[in-house]
């Protein structure tokens, strides 16, 4: 029997790439604001806005074998231009929504289930203009490790920390050739990430054959967090 995976925010970018890679082997449930890119895919769509809606398990199966939370923000501004409301909004979307959903789905998570969250390279590597998003993603890293400890050995919990990835979320940072080249050159591998780079690791962490990795924050960042070659 196919195993069940819940993707929140799986209608574009990294989440969509994960769904494409896993739809043949798993039964995929996607909770997202939009579904136009899902119409010809073998997935179950649940209308859900992580910033405004209350998540329920009404449309979920009895058992879940995997959970991925994909929504995020790239709110890059100097601290003096950020309001407290901006920090609250980033925390709500990136962190508090995860907590709310996890509390709903935990009773459905089976023995050996896997959860995957997303952080950012800017948590481990201090970067200017990242105060709000780094704070929110840092909360995810702490939550992920504590959750992994609390629910071991039943549930594995890991977080992926990417650098800049070419997705709709980062469009304004990569919307012309000059910007793209600057961002490419910042990375030791001389390119920004693609959705498939991150999705490949997420799928690996979800796979039931990968049963000895938990409580980790794994960087997928073209080497930018550890290599200084510029």
Q: What are these regions, as identified by a protein language model?
A:
Residues 78-79, 83-91, 183:
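Substrate-binding pocket helix/loop in short-chain dehydrogenase/reductase
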Residues 203, 214-230:
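Short C-terminal tail/terminal secondary-structure segment
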Residues 152-156, 213-215:
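Short, small/polar-rich loop/turn modules that mediate ligand/substrate recognition or access, typified
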Residues 11, 19:
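N-terminal Rossmann NAD(P)H-binding glycine-rich loop of SDR-like oxidoreductase domains
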Residues 102, 136, 144:
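Active-site helix of classical SDR
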Residues 187-198:
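A conserved structural motif in NAD(P)-dependent oxidoreductases
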Residues 107, 148-153:
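Alpha-helical segment proximal to the catalytic Tyr-Lys
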């Amino acid at each position: 029997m196919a195993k069940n995976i819940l993707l929140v925010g799986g209608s574009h970018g990294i989440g969509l790439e994960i769904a494409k890679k896993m739809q043949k082997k798993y039964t995929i449930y996607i909770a997202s604001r939009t579904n136009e890119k899902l119409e010809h895919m073998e997935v179950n769509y649940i209308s859900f806005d992580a910033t405004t809606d209350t998540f329920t398990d009404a449309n979920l199966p009895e058992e879940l074998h995997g959970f991925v939370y994909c929504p995020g923000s790239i709110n890059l501004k100097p601290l003096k231009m950020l309001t407290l409301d901006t920090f609250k909004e980033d925390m709500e979307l990136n962190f508090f929504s995860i907590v709310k959903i996890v509390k709903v789905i935990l009773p459905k998570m089976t023995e050996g289930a896997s959860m995957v969250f997303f952080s950012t390279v800017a948590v481990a590597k201090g970067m200017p203009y990242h105060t709000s998003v780094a704070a929110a993603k840092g909360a995810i890293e702490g939550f992920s490790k504590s959750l992994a400890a609390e629910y071991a050995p039943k549930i594995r919990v890991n977080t992926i920390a990417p650098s800049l990835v070419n997705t709709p979320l980062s469009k304004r940072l990569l919307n012309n050739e000059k910007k793209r080249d600057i961002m490419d050159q910042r990375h030791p591998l001389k390119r920004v990430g693609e959705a498939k780079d991150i999705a490949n690791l997420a799928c690996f962490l979800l796979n039931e054959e990968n049963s000895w990795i938990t409580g980790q924050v794994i960087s997928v960042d073209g080497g930018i967090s550890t290599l200084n070659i510029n």
